[in-house]
Amino acid sequence: MPPELKFRPMTRSELDILVEWAAAEGWNPGFNDAQIFWDTDPQGFIAAELAGELVGGGSIVSYDGRFGFMGFFIMRPDQRGQGLGKRLWFHRRDLLISRLQPPAVIGMDGVFHMQDFYARGGFVYSHRDLRFEGVGALAETDSDLVDLSEVPFEELLRFDNAHFPAPRERFLWAWIGQPGSRALGAKQDGSLHGYGVIRPCRRG
């Protein structure tokens, strides 16, 4: 009888294993990503186990029960093509739904060629993001940009709440203050109109 595929909460050390798998796939995760998202929602990481071994996993982070996000979905290379990932994906979706308050929305990262699969899980294509790599050069900072440390956190939180589906105070505080990063805000007429964070990754 073949071993049973089991789903369970992931441990913090197992998340580091997934980070290594992701890096091997060229995903280029940030150095601090795992800890920040873990601190945001420690229950938001699901492991797939086969015969006592970790064979896959992914995140199902809940923001205050009002918005959920599925990401970091990966299977160990030798366990792909057997339908195990599909079972894990739907388990994660259903578990995240159970953790949210209706009518909360779920977002997700995905790969473009799997849109039909995501659609079968109830997702609708929204937008596409592209990653570019290049060698930076020193340049002057635009006069409208300020260090985010100069912006009161309450003002940043109000701006973020107006543009993100749910409050994420704990995540935001950690995200803008992570080691080695630079966080900038765009101000016009004294008001915050945007912000961004550049963070160190495996490559870049």
Q: Can you name each region flagged by the protein language model?
A:
Residues 5-6, 103-106, 144:
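Short active-site oxyanion
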Residues 15, 19-59, 161-183, 187:
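Active-site rim helix/loop that mediates acceptor-substrate recognition in acyltransferases
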Residues 47, 53-61, 68-74, 185, ...:
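Conserved beta-strand in the GNAT
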Residues 72-75, 81-96, 120:
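Conserved acetyl-CoA-binding loop-helix of GNAT-fold acetyltransferases
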Residues 96-111:
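Conserved GNAT acetyl-CoA-binding A-motif
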Residues 107, 115-118:
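Hydrophobic, ordered structural segments
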Residues 121-203:
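Amide-forming acyltransferase catalytic core, primarily the GNAT-like/NAT-type
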